Amino acid sequence: MRVKYFGTDGIRGVFGETLTDELAFKVGKALGEIVGEGRVIVGKDTRVSGDSLEAAISAGLTSMGVDVLLCGVLPTPAVALLTRITRSFGVVISASHNPPEYNGIKVLKGGYKIPDEMEVKIEEKIESGYFPVRSVVGRTKSFREGRDMYIGAVLEIFRDLDLTGEMVSLDLANGATTTTAKEVFEFLGAKVEVFNDSQDGLLINQGCGATHPRFLAEEMKNGKVGFTFDGDGDRVIAVDEERNVVNGDRIIGILAVGLKEEGRLNSDTVVGTVMTNGGLEDFLKERGIKLLRTKVGDKYVLEKMIESGANLGGERSGHIIILDRSTTGDGLITALELMRVLRRSGRNLSDFAKEIPDYPQITKNVRRTERMSLENENLRKIVEESTSRGYRVVIRPSGTEPVVRITVEGKDREEIEKIVEEISRVLES
């Protein structure tokens, strides 16, 4: 069966349109049938629709005899950690970096996003419309101590990191890291300047956060380094002391060098995606580090990491997984690991980042239509000809939006623009 509701990062849509309370209730019942008489940990970001979806999912779960532990506002990686500690299932209600009108449902088990096969199983149960009547009804309970458990775990990981004297600026995207990031940095000794720390559900990701890093670059006043998170806290982008944005590729490059120097980089291998910049690949190759590429999506990065034995991988967007620290992308852990590498080296972030080439790369979204075909002879010729001239072309349907993304990378920006427009015309014709 083709997956109907789940995309590359769970179920996602505009609340009240493609994502409804009715669907959330059914997801809860379907998941509840799989879980049995166990428990599910539920967290959410700050979106207004989060309360409604939380109630609907909880109702579905409890009707199937499952107890629900409500964490309230908590980052996705925090819920993942809690499911790993308790060996249980979890649900995160979040649309990550998307605007406030969107929301989503992510399902976790034992620290990881559930595999495709389990997503299909949930799909099939929803589509069948049949759910057995359970003699036992579950209960919902507050689990606000989950936040403290997560913060405690992060502080234990970085127990030797002393940030005394560091000036750090944080853009919390008015999202889930409002409950964790500032407190952790301050506990480790940093002086913290905070932006966008509201839990008003209408402001999440609005002109701020990891998808708008220029906000922090322009507004930070006191920070020697800045970190900007997305709505659910699984992404992070950095800003250096010269107010330059340091994207996920460059963060991965810095971490790879730091981990290799410590003897912590498994197999001297890093996992990226088809969107990973060629500049990072060249930088790593010069230092004896191999880059493996996979499909876009942190779940696919994780799969390739487990398959290859790598412990570092991620995406340009700031989804970065450090597998000996966390089982999922965790913006806060990534930021702290970067601070640790910088402190050990005694170097500024800008010095490190400038060593990593970032070849010109243009991405354009084209609205996906029913008649649009990626199996197009003219398209194939453009891609082959461009590739033969040293340009890297990636054309892929988005897993979270109804668009096709065209990405072209190379060393001549004007030529890249021409290739992108040529491909756009073919797709739209």
Curated annotation (Swiss-Prot):
GO molecular function terms noted in the UniProt entry: magnesium ion binding; phosphoglucosamine mutase activity; phosphomannomutase activity
Gene: glmM
Active-site residues annotated for this sequence: S96 (phosphoserine intermediate)
Annotated Pfam families: PGM_PMM_I, PGM_PMM_II, PGM_PMM_III, PGM_PMM_IV
CDD domains: GlmM
Function of the molecule: Catalyzes the conversion of glucosamine-6-phosphate to glucosamine-1-phosphate.
Post-translational modification note: Activated by phosphorylation.
Keywords on record: Isomerase, Magnesium, Metal-binding, Phosphoprotein
Cofactor: Mg(2+)
GO BP annotation list: carbohydrate metabolic process; peptidoglycan biosynthetic process; UDP-N-acetylglucosamine biosynthetic process
Record protein name field: Phosphoglucosamine mutase
Origin species: Thermotoga petrophila (strain ATCC BAA-488 / DSM 13995 / JCM 10881 / RKU-1)
Enzyme class: isomerase
Its EC number(s): 5.4.2.10
Annotated binding of Mg(2+), by residue: S96, D230, D232, D234
Family the entry assigns: Belongs to the phosphohexose mutase family.
Cofactor binding comment, as recorded: Binds 1 Mg(2+) ion per subunit.
Modified residues (Phosphoserine): S96
Catalytic reaction annotation: alpha-D-glucosamine 1-phosphate = D-glucosamine 6-phosphate
InterPro entries membership: A-D-PHexomutase_a/b/a-I, A-D-PHexomutase_a/b/a-I/II/III, A-D-PHexomutase_a/b/a-II, A-D-PHexomutase_a/b/a-III, A-D-PHexomutase_C, A-D-PHexomutase_C_sf, A-D-PHexomutase_CS, Alpha-D-phosphohexomutase_SF
GO cellular component, one term: cytosol
